[in-house]
Amino acid sequence: MSDRIEPKRYDETSPRYAGWRVVLACFLVALFLFGFGLYGHGVYVAELQRLRGWPAALISGASTLTFLLSNVFATFTSELIARFGPRRLILLGIAALAASTTLLAFAREPWQLYAAFILMSFGWIGMGTVVIATIVSFWFERRRGLAISLAFNGASLGGVVVAPILVLLVEEVGFSAAMLTATAIMVVILVPVVVAWIGPRPPSADPAERETQYSSSSQMPAAATDISRAIIVRQLAFWTISVPFALALVAQIGFIVHQIALLEPKIGRPGAGFAVALTTAMAVIGRLCLGMVVDRLNPRLVTAASLASQAAALLTITQTDNPTVLLAAGAVFGFSIGNLITLPPLIIHREFDAAAFAVVMGLSSAISGTVGALGPGLVGLVRSWSGGYAVPLAICITLELVAAVIVLCGGQKQHTIATV
C-alpha cells in the first residue's frame, strides 16, 4: 500500500483549517521581528547614546547597515528556504535575532554594536516578509489575500506592542535587563509556536502541483533553486512591480520618519504624537479591510488606488493647518500603509509561476527595500535645502503618482520562468 496521502480539497474558510494556525504563527513572527528589528531601533538609539555616550550617527549607521544587508540577502531567500525548509529557517532567524538583542544588552564597544546589528540582519532573512509570504502562500489559494494580510498585521502591531513594552521595561529594570527579559519572552513564545504550527503544507488537489510537493522534504518546488534571475529581470512585469513599490516606499518611509517633525509646528507635540498613533492604527485597520476583499479584486488596481489616496492625503497636509483635517489626512495615508507589504506577493502570485514566487519576491523586496531606505535621507536633505517640508512633500506626491501609473502598466499574464 502506498504511503502517499491522497489529496483533497481543504476548506480555507473553516476556522479549523490548519492554515490559520500557520497564519497566527507568522503573525507572531512578524510582531517580534518588526518590534525588535524596526520599531525598537528608536529605543536602542536613545538608550545607547545615554549609557555609552556614543554619537547618534554611530548607532544610526549600524541600524542602516542592518537594513542594507537584509535587503541584499533577501535576494537569496528562495535558496535558503529550499536548503533549510521554512520551519528551520525561521528558527535560525529567531536564534539570530535573539543573539542580536542579547549582544546589544552587553555591548560596550562599537564593534560589538555593529556585530549585534549584523546579526539582526540575519534575523530579518529568516523571519522577514519574503519568508512569511512564501509560507502563507503554501497553505492558501482562494483566501490567500486575507491570510497574508492577517499575517502581516503582526508587523504593524510590533510598533504598538513590542516597542512600548521595551520602553516600560527600560524604565523599570534598566536597558540590559529589559533587553534580556524581552528576548526571553520572544524565544519562549515563538519557538514552540513555530515548531508546532509551521510544517509541511497539505497536499494539493492539483496533480501537477502535488508532484512538486513530494519532491522536497522542505516542501519547496524542486526547481525553485534553478530559477534564472537573469530571465526574471528581463520581464517587464517584474519591473512594473518592483519600481512602483520602490518609489512608493521612498515616499511612505520618508513621510513616516518625518511625520512628527512635520506636524509638530502645526498641531503641537501631543497632537503630532496622536497623529502617528492614529496613522499606525489605521494601517492595521486598512490591512484587515483589504484582506476581506482583495481576493476578489485586481491587486494592481488596488495598488494604484492606494498610492493615489496617499498622494491625496499628502497634498491635503501641505494645504492646511487645521488639526482635524490633518489628523484625517494622516488616517487616510495610514489606511494603505500596510497594503504596500501585502500587495506585492499577491501580484507576483497572479503573474508568475508558483515555483518562481520566492525568487521573484526576494528580488523585488531587495530592490524596493533598498531604494525605500533612502526615503528619510532624501526628505531630510531636501528639507534642509529648501527650508521647509513643502518641496519634500511635493516630491513624495510625485513619486506616489508616478508609481500608480507604472503599476497599471503591468498585466495579468502568467509568466513562465525558465530554469538553468
What are these regions (language model features)?
Residues 351-386:
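A late C-terminal transmembrane helix in Major Facilitator Superfamily
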